[in-house]
Amino acid sequence: MPSPQLVLLLPKDSYRNEDFLTAASRLGVDVIQAKNQCHQLADYWGLEQMLALPFDDPQRAARMVREQLGDALPVAVLGVDDQGAEVAAAINQILGLSANTPEAVAQLRDKYRFRKLQMECRLPAPQVVPFAGDEDVSAMKLPFGFPCVVKPSRLSGSRGVIRVDMSDQFVDAVDCVKTILRHEASVAESSSVLVEQYLPGSEHALEGLMVGGRLRVLALFDKPDPMEGPYFEETIYVCPSGLRAEVQSSFEQQVETVCRHAGVLEGPVHAEARIDGATVTLLEVAPRSIGGLCARMLRHTLGMTLEEVILHHAIGQSIDPAPASTGATGVMMLPVEAGGVFDRVTGLDAARAVPGVESIEITARKGDRVQPLPEASTYLGFIFASANTPDEVTATLRQADATLGVVINPLLGVDTTVVS
C-alpha cells in the first residue's frame, strides 16, 4: 500500500521545518516540500521533491500545485506557520481537498476580525478601534482610556504590540507599528493598526487540535513572567497549568466556540488568553501550532512529538497520545535584548549542566542581524527543562538562563555583551 502523500508548506526561514520532516519520516508519510523560494535556485541547488511557490499569492500557488502534480493529488496540504495556514487553505480549496476554508482561516488570522468574532459569540473582549493609514492619529478620540495597546492586525506573536500609558506616547507607538508594517511585505497591504483596551491579568496559552468541530486540548501553559509591557516579550512556558479547573474549562470552551463560529473545524490551533480572576479573555486563536521550537517541550506530555500528532490528523489517522512521563516541563525563549549582529552565546556548558535542563538550542547564526521588540520576529534560542513541578521547572530555566551571556556586535562593529 503506497504511503500517504502530503504537501508541506515550509517557509525557508522557519524553525519548524526539520521537526515536521523528521515526524513525517518517522510516520512513513511521503512529503512533497513546498517552499517560498525561487524556482531557478531550487533547480540549481538540486532540491528534490520540492515545489517553489509564491506564499504571498495563494491563488497562484494553488494553480502551480495543480499544474505540477497533475492527477497525483496529495491527501492534504499543510502549512506550518500563520502565512502557510492561509496558503494551505487556498490550495486545499482549489484542489477540492477537505480542509478549513480560506475565509475561516482569515477570520482567525486577522486580529480585528477575531475581535468581532468574539463579540458575535458574546465572549469577553476588549474594545478595539481600527484606523486607516492616512488618519490623523493625534486627533483620534478613543472610546476608552489609558492604558491601551497599539498593535498590527496581522503580525504574529508580540511583534509590533506596544502598551501606551499616556497620550503623549500614543502617536509614537502608532508610528512605530506603521514602520514595522511597511517593512513586512507579506502583510503590508492587508494589515491595519489597531488600538484596544489593555487587559490586566496573567497570560496563558493553549495548544489544541480541532477534530470534527470539537477541540481536543493537548496542553495548557502558564507564563510565569508578567506580561505588562511596554513590549510583551515571550519568555517562559510551563505545563501542566496551575489554573483552576473551572478557569481552564472556560478557556477551552471559548477557543472551541470561536473556532466553530469561524469555520475552523479541523487541524491545530494555538490560543493565548489573559486571565483576571475568573474572567478569561482570549487574545488570539491562531489556526496553526505553537511557534519556534517550543513544541519540543510537549513530547513528555503527549508521548510523541506535536508534529507527529498534527501529521496523524492531517492524513486522517486517529491518534491517542499517551504521556511518556509525569511531572512538569517547560521552555524558555531567549529574547533579543539589543539590536545588532549576533556573534555568540557564552556559558552554554554551565547552563546545560544545570540539573533538570534537557537541552539548549541556539537558533541564531553568527552574522545574523537581530532586533529586540517591538520589531523582533525571532529568538536567539530555546532552553528546555523538566522537573517534578512547574515551579521547579521555572527555577531551572531561570538558573540556566542566568549563566548565559549574549554577544551582539553593533552595526558599527564594536562588541557589546548582554548578560541574561
Could you tell me what each predicted segment is?
Residues 335-366:
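Glycine-rich active-site loop/lid that clamps phosphate-bearing ligands
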Residues 1-104, 135, 363-378, 386-419:
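ATP-binding N-terminal substructure of ATP-dependent carboxylate-amine bond-forming enzymes
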Residues 118, 143-164, 182-201, 206, ...:
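ATP-grasp fold ATP-binding core
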Residues 93-160, 179, 183-184:
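A conserved helix-loop-beta module that forms one wall/lid of the active-site cleft
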Residues 176-178, 345-348, 393-402:
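Short amphipathic alpha-helices in soluble, non-transmembrane regions
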Residues 124-127, 147-150, 164-200, 231-237, ...:
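Conserved ATP-binding module of the ATP-grasp superfamily
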Residues 208, 279-288:
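A short beta-strand motif that forms the metal-chelation/ATP-contact edge
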Residues 2, 249-271, 276, 286-343:
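Active-site "cap" helix and flanking loop/linker of ATP-utilizing ligase/carboxylase catalytic domains
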